[in-house]
Amino acid sequence: MKIAYVVSSKKKCGPNIVILNIVKELANKHEMEIFFLDESDDDVFECVNVKSTQIKKASDLKEHLKRFDIIHSSGIRPDALVVLCKVIYRVKCKIITTIHNYVFQDLYYSYGLVKSLIWGLLWCSIWLFFDKLVILSKNADNYYWFLPSAKKNIIYNGIDDNDCLQNKKCNYRKEFNIPDDGILAGSCANLTKCKGIDLVIQTLTKEHKIYYIVAGDGIEKHNLINLVKARKLHERVYFIDFLDEPESFMSQLDVFLMPSRSEGFGLTVLESTKLGIPVITSNIPIFMELFDQMCLTFDIKNPSTLIDVITYAKKNRLHLSQKFHAIFQDRFTSSKMATKYENVYNNLFREVL
């Protein structure tokens, strides 16, 4: 099969990591190429021997896509361009996209009610033209009840389960003068309202021996810094920039926090579990479905419960990490994910013949 991937850019982000892991697993069996729209400082695909080509206008993409059997896109602009090539330019191929978010919730937390409705409806309309839609969970399948059932496939995300931990570039306990008996918690996120980082900050006090490091950037970062100042937690909560390779940071934590209000999947849950770090998530439906036996949870409507859960995770770290890691290997490896995607590709390819 000849398979093309169309993405917004080559920067490191959740959707691109998913495509990277599919390519890693399947590139030796199929002819593949990655098409991207925007330049970026980093290139998440540089570790795979697959050609990548920048696309600057739809007509260019049309000419390229004529060579392929399957087109797999990710993101609103790539989705729109692929549909344009399929419907307007009559490119004869099968098209598939992965829906990584709860579109109206995700857009609402970033852009407000009006824009979330406008862009959400537009994006959902675009999806109707795809031959297949990959949904990341049963919960998301119910959320997108209005999309045709025959087009939807549920595939859980997965990550490479090989050991890839880099040498420590920074000792975070030493950097921030965190005592040995302090509990070091952390999060990695694009700092938007839906990530729920503020819930953790509002729960912590100076009396707790819990220290919290937030790695990431985003539109909410300034507000979160101000919240830390207002609560006088500058000796408990610290911010560091987005990390291209977060494994070293995660490996130094006692517990990883994922306090999201809304989430499409949560790849960092898998990354932390792979490293043997216990994970605590909010009790939103998507996490309860995916990670019910693989994470601890706290009540998002009563965030004060988080303190007790963090303390429990620290005391039982060894047992929890072993238990959670075994479940990760059983459910969420990239090889399992890629096999399911390949089955979808094969079914579509048979329709092309």
Swiss-Prot record:
Disulphide bridges: none
Cellular localization per UniProt: Membrane
Recorded superkingdom: Bacteria
Keyword Transferase attributed: yes
UniProt key word Endoplasmic reticulum: no
GO BP annotations listed: Gram-negative-bacterium-type cell outer membrane assembly; lipopolysaccharide biosynthetic process; O antigen biosynthetic process
Ranges annotated as spanning the membrane: 116-136
A single GO cellular-component term on record: membrane
This enzyme's EC code(s): 2.4.1.-
Phenotype of null mutants: Loss of LPS O-antigen production.
Pathway: Bacterial outer membrane biogenesis; LPS O-antigen biosynthesis
Span(s) of short sequence motif E(x7)E glycosyltransferase motif: 263-271
Protein family (similarity comment): Belongs to the glycosyltransferase group 1 family. Glycosyltransferase 4 subfamily.
Functional summary from the UniProt entry: Involved in the assembly of the O-repeating unit during O-antigen biosynthesis. N-acetylglucosamine transferase accountable for the alpha-D-GlcNAc-1,4-beta-D-Gal linkage within the O-antigen.
More about this protein: According to PubMed:32421169, the hydrophopic domain of this protein is likely to play a role in stabilizing the association of it with peripheral membrane or possibly, with the hydrophobic moiety of the acceptor substrate. However, a transmembrane domain is predicted by a program.
Protein's UniProt name: O-antigen biosynthesis glycosyltransferase WclY
Encoding gene, per UniProt annotation: wclY
